[in-house]
Design a protein with these regions (language model features):
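Membrane-proximal basic amphipathic "stem/tether" segments
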Residues: 1-56, 61
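A short, glycine/small-residue-rich beta-strand->loop->alpha-helix junction that serves as a flexible
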Residues: 35, 39, 47, 59-72, ...
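Extended catalytic core of nucleotide-activated donor transferases of GT-like folds
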Residues: 43-44, 58, 69-79, 85-181
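Short beta-strand->alpha-helix junction loop in the catalytic core
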Residues: 91-92, 165-167, 187-205
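Short acidic alpha-helix that forms the nucleotide-activated donor recognition element
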Residues: 273-286, 296, 315
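Nucleotide-sugar-dependent
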Residues: 289-311, 315, 323-331
Length: 362
């Protein structure tokens, strides 16, 4: 919000006599104005009046992220004979995560954050055979909150929820969902039922580019990926005299300092919408998850959560270049991936560059 909007907000609520009530209204109006989207308001009204057909399941994503899992869930349900409606935050919808479906295959609706708290009161929910929440946490609240409890959806008996972080099961009180088999996870963990969606359209096998293309996708933060590993690997490859390759970097954030002699090999695309990201994935030959075995923060990707990189590798059938520590959890081995340990990422990238088209196709 701008300073002028903040001042106007305070003036509008000054007439409310009770401090707690005044604070509550200021918070609501601030959230409403900062997230306001006219199309989303219209879409939400249309959804509430929507004549839901039989055997329809609602997929609901309350956040601005995790759009990569929605197409796979939609594909699974459509293949099982269900109809699918999707309700998502308007900022995610603008990124077009469902661009791989034909118009009419799925009904798509959008909403603002301020619509979520009253969601459970919507009568249209009773018409769905089931409701699938693709992220159980609501990230718009500091420290995150349980979207199910916040909205009252946890009281629905036909609810399924996807938990992206096992540590949140006790924090959000999801033990009963887990016991009833209604809590889903994207990986094979001791808790939750594994369902790994990774559909991004019909993607035929493609031959390797004459000059191999590597790609990494995701937020440029040390907590998620170690991009210093990539710089070191590029140094290794260049020192061996190879120049016939490129690396596409997709994601928001700061990459850090890149030596000038390495920049010609990098294409920093920044954050892309889903159609552009899908196109970049199609052009690539190898995927770089950039998980660091020496970073304790990356242990969560084999203990309590998964990396979204795996969904992209599975769905686009790209060869991952990944450290052995993380490989087996995702089903990667010497037959379907390029693994490294002592030889480092640079050594594995050299093996990729030296592969023939026949070896790649195997």
């Amino acid at each position: 919000m701008t300073h002028t909007q903040t001042v106007m907000l305070r003036l509008l609520t000054m007439c409310i006599p009770f401090r707690n009530l005044r604070k509550k209204w200021r918070t609501f109006l601030r959230d409403f104005l900062s997230d306001y989207d006219r199309d989303a308001r219209r879409s939400m009204r249309a959804w509430r009046r929507h004549p839901v057909a039989g055997r329809t399941i609602l997929i609901l994503e309350p956040n601005y992220c995790h759009g990569e899992v929605i197409p796979g869930f939609c594909r699974h349900l459509l293949d099982m004979g269900y109809r699918v409606d999707v309700l998502m935050h308007h900022s995610l919808a603008r990124q077009s995560p469902l661009c791989c479906f034909k118009e009419g295959d799925i009904h798509i609706f959008t909403a603002m954050c301020t619509s979520w708290k009253r969601l459970a009161k919507a009568r249209v929910l009773t018409r769905y055979e089931a409701i699938l929440i693709s992220t159980s946490a609501f990230y718009d609240i500091p420290g995150w909150a349980s979207f199910l409890h916040m909205t009252g959806l946890d009281k629905f008996a036909n609810l399924l929820a996807v938990e992206h972080e096992l540590k949140d099961i006790p924090r959000f009180g999801e033990e009963e969902l887990d016991r009833q088999g209604r809590l889903l996870t994207l990986g094979s963990f001791p808790r939750g039922m594994m369902v790994n969606p990774h559909f991004f359209g019909e993607i035929p096998p493609a031959p390797r580019n004459r000059e191999p293309v590597f790609i990494t996708v995701g937020s440029l933060s040390a907590q998620r990926k170690n991009h210093e590993l990539l710089v070191e690997a590029l140094e290794t490859v260049c020192n061996e005299g190879y120049r016939n390759f490129s690396v596409i970097i997709v994601g928001e954030g700061e990459l850090g300092k890149i030596p000038g002699h390495l920049r010609p090999f990098l294409h920093v695309a920044g954050k892309l919408d889903f159609p552009a990201m899908y196109e970049a994935m199609r052009r690539a030959d190898y995927f770089l998850p950039l998980l660091d075995p020496g970073n304790p923060a990356h242990n969560r990707y084999i203990t309590t959560g998964v990396t979204g990189s795996a969904q992209l590798v599975y769905g686009f059938a790209k060869i991952p270049v990944i450290h052995e520590k993380f490989a087996s959890f995702y089903g990667f081995n010497d037959r379907n991936a390029l693994l490294y340990r002592e030889e480092t990422l640079g050594g594995a990238m050299l093996r990729a560059i030296r592969q023939t088209e026949e070896e790649y196709a195997e």
